[in-house]
Regions:
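Active-site beta-loop-alpha junctions enriched in small/polar residues
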Residues: 20-22, 55, 85-89, 131-134, ...
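Glycine-rich, positively charged active-site loop/lid region within alpha/beta enzyme cores that binds
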Residues: 92-99, 200-258, 275-281
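Short, well-ordered coil/turn segments that N-cap beta-strands
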Residues: 13-14, 46-48, 77-80, 123-127, ...
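Glycine/proline-rich, positively charged
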Residues: 93-187, 194
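Conserved small/polar residues in nucleotide/adenosyl-binding loops
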Residues: 287-294
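N-terminal binding-site loop/beta-alpha segment at the start of enzyme catalytic domains
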Residues: 1-81
Length: 298
């Protein structure tokens, strides 16, 4: 797997491992053995970039993902780039599967969160630390200032923003240079292409989450009933309703034809498309059954 540069100097594999699905949002939780097998396979195929967040977990174990990775990634820590996120919590009063997020970008929250993440991840620093969502009640300059302090203390080496607008990016970058923006991006969701000019101007990388549209672009799902496991966020996503699947059927059929012509899979075609867009785009992907597909792209 080739290397890409986020920001000015953060070297990562061109496809990262989005670890959320091992603990959160897809209806199943990986055992340590399953996680070890997936991560070992990813590393063997050249993946060096692993993405998590303090909020990825279960009701019983809210920080499951970081704790799991703290055990599984420990033997590889000096060989990988480890990213995590802070600054949101779930609205536990909600009864929906996909609970609303409550942003919290206060400096005191960020400083408390990094200590918990470092402990759970069994490391003395993070290579990339994001504010997970933008808290519009806190000036972004204060959030950026807290990240700058963490960098000066050696607790993080780079920082980033998730789901940020151009205005927020520019204001944050003035306080402390931003290395990466992590936003939703795929063939099915291209709104953030409008940020590409400012990212190029400021030399900021773009990390794409949900690059396979939460699995839609694998062309493997055909019925809403496939997402009925408790905690599977896809049960509430419009693209996975019976109507949504029907509307996208023609596109998925076309993807299958293209994939067959290239002796590839729809997932590989999707990732190859993304990697060809810009040299500073790095998709982070997770699929239990497609760990090989996402790294063996075209």
């Amino acid at each position: 797997m080739e290397i890409r540069i986020l920001g000015r100097d953060l070297e990562v594999s061109e496809i990262g491992f989005g670890c959320m699905g091992m603990s959160h949002a897809y209806g199943t939780v990986s055992t340590q053995k399953e996680a070890e097998e997936l991560i070992e396979k990813a590393i063997d195929e050249g993946c060096t970039f692993f993405d998590t967040a303090e909020i990825y977990g279960t009701t019983e174990d809210p920080h499951h993902n970081e704790k799991l990775l703290g055990k599984v990634l420990r033997p590889y820590r000096n060989k990988i780039v480890l990213a995590s996120k802070c600054g949101i919590r779930f609205d536990e009063t909600a009864t929906t599967v996909n609970k609303p997020l409550i942003p919290d970008g206060r400096p005191e929250t960020i400083k408390a969160s990094i200590e918990g993440s470092l402990m759970r991840l069994n490391t003395d620093h993070l290579d990339l630390y994001y504010i997970h969502r933008i808290d519009m009640t806190v000036p972004i300059e204060e959030t950026a200032g807290a990240m700058k302090e963490l960098m000066e203390q050696g607790k993080i080496t780079h920082w980033g923003l998730s789901e940020a607008s151009e205005e927020i990016i520019r204001r944050a970058h003035k306080v402390c240079p931003v290395t990466a923006i992590q936003n939703r991006y795929s063939m099915m969701y291209r709104d953030y292409e409008k940020l590409f000019p400012v990212l190029e101007e400021l030399k900021i990388g773009f990390v794409a989450f949900s690059p396979l549209a939460n699995g839609l672009l694998t062309a493997a799902y055909h019925s809403h009933g496939e997402f009925e496991k408790p905690g599977d966020y896809r049960s509430a996503m419009p693209q996975f309703t019976e109507e949504g699947l029907k509307e996208n059927n023609e596109f998925m059929s076309w993807m299958k034809v293209i994939a067959e012509e290239k002796n590839a899979t729809p997932a590989q075609i999707s990732l190859a498309w993304m990697l060809a867009k810009k040299p500073y785009i790095v998709p982070v992907s997770y699929t239990h059954l497609r760990a090989h597909e996402t790294s063996a792209h075209l």
